[in-house]
């Protein structure tokens, strides 16, 4: 059973975009179901065909993909095309601040857009600030080009925010943007003549001592985030105008702390009602914040703790579809096992959420902890069979199965492998006989293994299918 279902009534109310344009049939699929975040820059996607990547994604029951785009030159158009052949929609996901953009793909003179903070903790990242209209216009053209050139079905920004989390409550205070450009823009927009101080409580402009001005700053940050998002989506020559029929999702964080909605509004400039009202998305996502995903003790039913965020979406727009993003793997010690995932999906169904996604497909539990699972078998030619596994297998598997009596058909006749080739998660075997007419086969997959060299460190152990393991599957 799928964990996410959407009522027919809700579906029929959201197939038309905010500007009256209907979503394309493939883009509509992003409104519901289980999706994943994919970053094709990881080693596991190297030296294999685009078809094998698409087959692995589909073999895992994925119904939609959020393609995490950092370097535009590295986007795999061939993988997107292969997913489309299989009916899987692909949305582009970008970081709104451009934090991970390679220097050679940043706007000219990008340094003038850079956020500044009260300490050096964020210096390793290169966040660009939402206060700069020319940066928003540059990003708008970039996103439109990405969608149209690579054939994306949808688009979203992750982390359109000022990334300080609880920085105001730390001993070593973290706050931003405090760049001269941001301060000037704030004063110009509000008429305030001073900018708050966040570190030295003895100064007369310490933020707690000037609550009216500080509140102006809170509201100003929210406006800059929403204006940036809105410019990219609804501005002249933006996504709605230049990419008709494309799905658009807005995206804010959630967190399991008391008064979390108000705190993220204040801390990071994230305001669900105004973002939805201004940008008019097809769906709104809640992303799991790092204090939660890094918590090894986090329970799989934690979406219940995010209910204030979910309720606020429905209060803003009762017909707005809701997506929920979880993080299964960013903290190696908190890689979430199958029972945790099962509880998570059951909880999302209980909350009547429309869609889920997770970070990130290639680092999931099964890649590190489980032997390869055979998902489908396909007759390529009368004596050639392609075995599709749920993850990348070792290139040694071709030699492992060579000369093995590997396949038994319905009538009990067995066939040996005379040659074999590995392509990612696909194992193509040439047999010593004709399988034409067979409808179901039994496959000996004992000894099939994965390869830790393709994993992100810590790489873990080799996972091997135990000897004597057989799978009976229909022959497609």
Residue ranges and their predicted role:
Residues 80, 89-150, 202-215:
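Active-site-adjacent "subsite" loops/lids of carbohydrate-active enzymes
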Residues 392-419:
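Short, surface-exposed alpha-helix to beta-strand junction/turn motifs within ectodomains of secreted
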Residues 277-371:
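Substrate-binding cleft of secreted/luminal carbohydrate-active enzymes
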Residues 43-73, 149-153, 275-287, 347-357:
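Catalytic domains of carbohydrate-active enzymes, especially glycoside hydrolases
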Residues 371-377, 412-413, 435-438, 442-476:
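Acidic, Ser/Thr/Gly/Pro-rich low-complexity segments and short DxT(G/T)-type signature motifs
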Residues 381-402, 431, 445:
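A short glycine/threonine-centered beta-strand motif
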Residues 91, 156-160, 214-266, 287, ...:
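Aromatic-lined carbohydrate-recognition surfaces of secreted/lumenal glycan-active proteins
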């Amino acid at each position: 059973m799928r964990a996410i279902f959407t009522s027919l009534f809700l579906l029929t109310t959201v197939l038309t975009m905010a500007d009256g344009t209907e979503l394309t049939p493939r883009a509509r699929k992003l409104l519901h179901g289980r999706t994943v975040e994919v970053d094709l820059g990881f080693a596991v996607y190297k030296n294999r065909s685009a078809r094998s990547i698409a087959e692995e994604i589909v073999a895992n029951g994925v119904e939609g993909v959020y393609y995490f785009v950092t370097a535009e030159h590295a986007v795999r158009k061939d993988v997107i095309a292969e997913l489309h052949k299989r009916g899987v929609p692909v949305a582009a996901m970008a970081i709104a601040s451009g934090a991970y953009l390679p220097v050679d793909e940043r706007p000219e003179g990008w340094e003038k857009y850079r956020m500044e903070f009260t300490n050096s903790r964020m210096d390793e990242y290169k966040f660009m600030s939402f206060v700069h209209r020319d940066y928003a216009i540059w990003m708008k053209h970039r996103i439109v080009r990405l969608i149209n050139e690579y054939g994306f079905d949808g688009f979203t920004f992750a982390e359109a925010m000022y990334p300080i989390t609880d920085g105001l409550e730390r001993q070593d205070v973290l706050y931003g943007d405090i760049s001269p450009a941001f301060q000037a823009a704030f004063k110009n927009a509000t008429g305030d003549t001073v900018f708050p101080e966040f570190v030295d409580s003895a100064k007369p402009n310490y933020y707690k001592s000037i609550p009216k001005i500080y509140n102006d700053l809170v509201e100003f940050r929210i406006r800059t985030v929403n204006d940036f998002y809105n410019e990219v989506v609804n501005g002249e020559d933006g996504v709605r105008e230049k990419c008709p029929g494309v799905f658009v999702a807005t995206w804010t964080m959630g967190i399991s702390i008391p008064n979390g909605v108000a705190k993220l509004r204040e801390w990071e400039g994230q305001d669900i009602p105004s973002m939805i009202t201004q940008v008019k998305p097809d769906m709104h996502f809640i992303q799991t914040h790092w204090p939660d995903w890094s918590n090894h003790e986090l329970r799989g039913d934690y979406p219940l703790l995010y209910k204030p965020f979910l309720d606020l979406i429905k209060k803003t727009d009762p017909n707005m579809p809701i997506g929920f993003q979880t993080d299964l793997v960013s903290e190696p010690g908190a890689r979430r096992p199958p029972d945790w995932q099962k509880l998570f999906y059951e909880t999302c169904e209980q909350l009547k959420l429309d869609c889920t996604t997770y970070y990130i497909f290639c680092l999931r539990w099964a890649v590190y902890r489980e032997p390869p699972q055979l998902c489908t078998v396909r007759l390529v030619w009368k004596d050639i069979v392609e075995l599709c596994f749920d993850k990348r297998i070792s290139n040694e598997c071709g030699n492992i199965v060579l000369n093995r009596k590997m396949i038994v058909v319905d009538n009990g006749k067995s066939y040996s492998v005379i040659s074999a080739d590995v392509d990612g998660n696909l194992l193509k075997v040439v047999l010593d006989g004709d399988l034409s007419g067979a409808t179901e086969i039994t496959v000996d997959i004992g000894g099939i293994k994965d390869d830790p060299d393709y994993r992100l460190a810590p790489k873990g152990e080799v996972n091997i299918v135990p000897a004597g393991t057989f799978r009976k599957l229909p022959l497609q």
